[in-house]
Amino acid sequence: TEEARLTKALFKLAVDTVGYGDFTRAKRGAGGDPANRFLDHGNYLAYGLGATATWVLGLPHGLAVLHGKTRRGGLVFDIADLVKDAHILPQAFLSAMRGDEEQGFRQNCIEALTRSEALDFMIDTARVVALGTAALASGRPV
């Protein structure tokens, strides 16, 4: 998919920028290297914000949009994707190269997500998409 190609290119950019060396994104928490561990940890922070955004808006968190019908919480993953590549991905590689502990990485992510008002952005974006989709479905002008 186009999303997968973009993410792969962003991983390469981050790896090259910090001089990380060989990197392969491990699936489902199987990575033992610091960058993979930080990516998993940070992604869960983003998923928490995504779940909060769906709750605030009263949207069903399990609605499958981009992440398909086979994943529970599909909408949460979709909304989390709005901030993961901008905040979590670069911080994972920076923290890995600095030798940060999990708590330091977590704190850096939380500060970046707070500074950028990530939750507000996620809520606003999901709201605009939901209202636009509802208007299209009802035949009203967007």
Residue ranges and their predicted role:
Residues 1-142:
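Active-site helix-to-loop segments that bind/position phosphate- or nucleotide-bearing substrates
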